[in-house]
Amino acid sequence: MDSNTVSSFQVDCFLWHVRKRFADQELGDAPFLDRLRRDQKSLKGRGSTLGLDIETATRAGKQIVERILEEESDEALKMTIASVPASRYLTDMTLDEMSRDWFMLMPKQKVTGSLCIRMDQAIMDKNIILKANFSVIFERLETLILLRAFTEEGAVVGEISPLPSLPGHTNEDVKNAIGVLIGGLKWNDNTVRVSETLQRFAWRSSHENGRPSFPPKQKRKMARTIESEV
């Protein structure tokens, strides 16, 4: 196993522990708590994949961080912060919408890259909107936290989420996953609309009204992908 992979996991575990202590003091805002929950799942998945104990890794990560801080000067810290581009966290969904329970009458699931796509193909003739919470850097989607498809009544009928055991995805990965989700939902004569925020940063190939246009051939291809590969 690569030593950098292990040490990276150890540092991530310790930094998550610090953030958890911060949250326990009720100091974290909604995006902070959201990322904390998602990162916890990711760390559990990585720990299982690497065969490493999280508590032991956290202690080792603490030693690594302490050693770095001992060598770090205030001036170097200022220069590092100034050189790192700042990302923005954008939220289409409230915490209630993100945590809302849902079930599927006709479940379909597909994994593409490090993203998991789930949808209920029993949904027909509904107006559906896609909403997402994600971070943006350089005016492009950086990290998808969660994307969900809602009916006008507020029911969740689809979802795209990162796989905890496979961290890391690109803007193109997210765009492809959105295309698969839209294709599956539109096959049952649902009307699918993308939120303005999501359309701006992650789905630029749509019309101004947020309704992506797919030719019939592409619709059939997407539907076959959902049916045959899920």
Swiss-Prot record:
Classification via InterPro entries: NS1, NS1A, NS1A_effect_dom-like_sf, uS15_NS1_RNA-bd_sf
Sequence segments annotated as region (CPSF4-binding): 180-215
Signal sequence, renumbered to the chain: none
Locus of motif Nuclear localization signal: 34-38
Annotated Gene Ontology cellular component terms: host cell cytoplasm; host cell nucleus
Keyword Transmembrane: no
Swiss-Prot/TrEMBL domain comment: The dsRNA-binding region is required for suppression of RNA silencing.
Name by which UniProt lists this protein: Non-structural protein 1
